[in-house]
Amino acid sequence: MKTYNVAIVGASGAVGQELIKGLENSFFPIKKFVPLASARSAGKKIRAFNKDYEILETTHEVFEKEEIDIAFFSAGGSVSEEFAISASKTALVIDNTSFFRLNKDVPLVVPEINAQEIFNAPLNIIANPNCSTIQMTQILNPLHLHFKIKSVIVSTYQAVSGAGNKGIESLKNELKTALEHLEKDPAIDLNQVLQAGAFAYPIAFNAIAHIDTFKENGYTKEELKMVHETHKIMGVDFPISATCVRVPVLRSHSESLSIAFEKEFDLKEVYEVLKNAPSVVVCDDPSHNLYPTPLKASHTDSVFIGRLRKDLFDKKTLHGFCVADQLRVGAATNALKIALHYIKNA
């Protein structure tokens, strides 16, 4: 079996760490592993494959020098903008950032939906979609193929780790501060003691309807990503409206979906379609309190869907609630599936 020299740009970050775990657990045919990061992190040690590796600085020359075959980028859009083209001259680049996603020469891939696009990459770069988009499309695509979707309204409840390690630390620190003050005074106004960390407002005991920057039309970039990326991945143009909210959950994103079909549908057929969809787990028995939760979805590679029900007033509309680990399903696992499909079929 052929083996590959693999680099991870942003190896010490939240997604980078999940990529390492995924590479270890998938028995990926690695010949050499090269962790890369900024000059600030270069020289530090990182644990992978039961040994310590020295992090190298990300430069334009390092990919050719280290003879990298596959490079995963998970260090932010500005890093991908600066270095991905250089890396793609000698390596297949799988980019976890938003920088290349809507580039017409870069395929945007969810392998369960459009794996064939992996081999339509003239720049030798493949984009990994937004985490919220990945889990949503894995529900929408099988339903669209069977019923034909007319429109979608989605509201997200996104974990702090979607903002990286700084998001995790903000929640931990703010919870500690809040609980210390609540212990002394249960009626205290937390607005007086909490300060914003990684987000626009304190995230502890809060919900913030603001992910990424606001655009002139009132939507955030995160909300528009879900619209435009879904259209590109699925090859559709039906209306999608998204509202994205950050919640004080450590890991796994949740989404409330309202899906309008072109015709009336049989709910039993919906269950059958989703039960047979790849990477989807139907978790739906309200009589036994069985429905998806972020805690249950964490550290798994499935998209969980439940609370499936017809709209009370519109027989063509389906409601549901889906949850997935955004660091795995929404980033690392999807990127690894792209790489595995590539080496299996190249």
From Swiss-Prot:
Sorted alphabetically, the Gene Ontology BP terms of this entry are: 'de novo' L-methionine biosynthetic process; diaminopimelate biosynthetic process; isoleucine biosynthetic process; lysine biosynthetic process via diaminopimelate; threonine biosynthetic process
Q: Where does NADP(+) bind?
A: S12, G13, A14, V15, R40, S41, S161, G162, Q326
Q: Which residues bind substrate?
A: Q158, R246
The terms under GO molecular function for this entry are: aspartate-semialdehyde dehydrogenase activity; NAD binding; NADP binding; protein dimerization activity
Please tell me whether the keyword Phosphoprotein is annotated for this protein: no
Q: Give UniProt keywords alphabetically.
A: Amino-acid biosynthesis, Diaminopimelate biosynthesis, Lysine biosynthesis, Methionine biosynthesis, NADP, Oxidoreductase, Threonine biosynthesis
Please name every pair of cysteines joined by a disulfide bond in this record: none
User: Would you say which domain of life the source belongs to?
Assistant: Bacteria
Per its UniProt record, what SMART domains does this chain match?
Semialdhyde_dh (SM00859)
Specify the pathway. Answer: Amino-acid biosynthesis; L-lysine biosynthesis via DAP pathway; (S)-tetrahydrodipicolinate from L-aspartate: step 2/4; Amino-acid biosynthesis; L-methionine biosynthesis via de novo pathway; L-homoserine from L-aspartate: step 2/3; Amino-acid biosynthesis; L-threonine biosynthesis; L-threonine from L-aspartate: step 2/5
Which proteins does it associate with, and in what oligomeric form? Homodimer.
Task: Report the protein name in the record.
Answer: Aspartate-semialdehyde dehydrogenase
Species this chain originates from? Helicobacter pylori (strain J99 / ATCC 700824)
